[in-house]
Each structure stands twice: as C-alpha cells, then as structure tokens.
From Swiss-Prot:
Name the UniProt record assigns to this protein: Adenine phosphoribosyltransferase
Reactions catalysed according to its record: AMP + diphosphate = 5-phospho-alpha-D-ribose 1-diphosphate + adenine
A Pfam family recorded for this sequence: Pribosyltran
Organism phylogeny: Bacteria, Pseudomonadati, Pseudomonadota, Gammaproteobacteria, Pasteurellales
Pathway the protein takes part in: Purine metabolism; AMP biosynthesis via salvage pathway; AMP from adenine: step 1/1
GO cellular component, as recorded: cytosol
Length: 179
C-alpha cells in the first residue's frame, strides 16, 4: 500500500454526523495510527521543503495537530490562528460567514513579518472560509499566502476554487466525494 492509500484508509467516515446527510471524515483514527500520521506530515513537508516558506500557520484547532510538526520538520516558526480571546498578546481579528451565522479568528499582531511567505495548514478543505479569513489576517500584517496544505479535501464543496480566486494554491493529500 502506498503512503497516500495508507493515509486515506486510516480516515474513518462517519455517516449522519454531526447531522443527517453529512459524512464526517474523522482524523482521530488517522492520529491513532502513528505510521499514517507520520506519512501525512512527511508528505506535506516533502511538498514544501525548499520552497521559500518562512512561517507555518495552523488554524484552530486541528490545524495545530498537523501544522506544528510540519513547521518543526521544516525548521520554521509555527503561528497559531485562534478563536477570539484565546491569545494573550495584542491581536488582529477577522470575521467570516458560516452556513448559519458568523465566526471570528485572531492572531498575534507580532507573529507575521512584512514579506513572510506563509504556508497555512489545516486538516480539511471544505468551503475554504476558514483559510480565506486566515489569509486576510496574514496579508493585513504584510505576509504573503500562496499555499495551503490539507490532509483531506472535499472538492464538491468548492474550497479549492475559492482559494484559487484569492491567489492560494491548495495541496491536499487525499480527497473524498460529498460533504
């Protein structure tokens, strides 16, 4: 079995969770398999090694699980993007629309430098809303976001196209049909 097949087969699909009609892609089963977890980190690192990335940003909260080891393997700083009131220093905020309502993300004002070339890492690409908001934060601080990496992609939900429209190339290890 190749590494990507190992990764995909390690992700359990849970029908009708969290609501009827949704198939939840559960990364906890991937995390419970150290060989598959390491393969996912190694594949992202291999894609972005020697590409001029200066910082890795992870989005709350599952982006932390994959982003921190990617940053460590690349020898780069890791920056957190969090929900409101979770970061202790001065922050910049960005609100974004959800299916029903709105959410907000924050990052420290001093975490991105002018002209940083940032890789954003998250567990899953669905609609791209979280990464769009994250990119706005980074760009407001003078950083560049040209790439985002995901373990899972759900192409039917349009996230890849949304990110392309804002100048971000998405890299996904495995894809699943549907929601």
């Amino acid at each position: 079995m190749n590494q990507l097949d190992l990764i995909k087969s390690s992700i359990k699909s849970i029908p009708n969770y969290p609501k009827v009609g949704i198939i939840f892609r559960d990364i906890t089963s991937l995390l419970e398999n150290p060989t598959a977890f390491k393969a996912s980190i190694d594949a992202i690192v291999a894609e972005f090694k020697n590409k001029g990335i200066t910082k890795v940003v992870g989005t709350e909260s599952r982006g932390f699980i994959f982003g921190a080891p990617v940053a460590l393997a690349l020898g780069l700083p890791f920056v957190l993007v969090r929900k409101p009131h979770k970061l202790p220093r001065a922050v910049i905020s960005q609100s974004y629309a959800l299916e029903y309502g709105e959410d907000t993300l924050e990052m420290h004002l001093d975490s991105i430098n002018q002209d940083d070339n940032v890789l954003v890492v998250d567990d899953l690409l669905a609609t791209g809303g979280t990464i769009d908001a994250t990119a706005k934060l980074i760009r407001q601080l003078g950083g560049q976001v040209k790439n985002a990496a995901f373990v899972i992609g759900l192409p039917d939900l349009g996230g890849k196209a949304r990110l392309e429209q804002i100048g971000i190339k998405s890299f996904t290890l495995v894809e699943f049909d549907g929601h």
